[in-house]
Amino acid sequence: MAHVIDLQVACTPTKLPTKEQFQLWVDTALAEVSSSPNQDFELTIRLVNNEESQQLNKQYRDKDKPTNVLSFPFEVPDGIELNLLGDLIICIEVMKQEAQEQNKALFEHWAHLVIHGCLHLVGFDHISDTEALEMESIEITILEKLGISNPYLEQ
């Protein structure tokens, strides 16, 4: 099973994970939580700068600042069968700054944000403490399968 990823680079990054790395992270996350593990999905991962992230965050969340990842699940109209999950928007500048401030390996933080965003696309959230603990637990499990340490431990 390989989900179709439309990778859009809308900024000038210094170094990116490979398309295969993005693919592995998405496939592993969705295999862990999908009710139809053999079903393929399509999603867009758009890599943006602070300006675009801030504009989208203000427009859709009324927060006038850039953020690390935004998730826009696709809502399929009744009676139509489409395997579109939605869009992930990852702000490279915020992601890099977080990794540095939290003493995290950049590659591991990339993986975490992609997985975190995928969980949002399939309906997970972290508004309440209970939801946050459930989502974090799933993220930790997925990351462990990829050989990546728990991102919630103090570094």
Swiss-Prot record:
GO terms for cellular component: cytoplasm
Location within or outside the cell: Cytoplasm
Main localization of the protein described in the UniProt heading: cytoplasm
The UniProt record lists the keyword Transferase: no
InterPro entries: MetalPrtase_cat_dom_sf_prd (IPR023091), YbeY (IPR002036), YbeY_CS (IPR020549)
Domain of life where this protein originates: Bacteria
Cofactor(s), by name: Zn(2+)
Role description: Single strand-specific metallo-endoribonuclease involved in late-stage 70S ribosome quality control and in maturation of the 3' terminus of the 16S rRNA.
Protein name according to UniProt: Endoribonuclease YbeY
Organism: Colwellia psychrerythraea (strain 34H / ATCC BAA-681) (Vibrio psychroerythus)
Protein encoded by which gene: ybeY
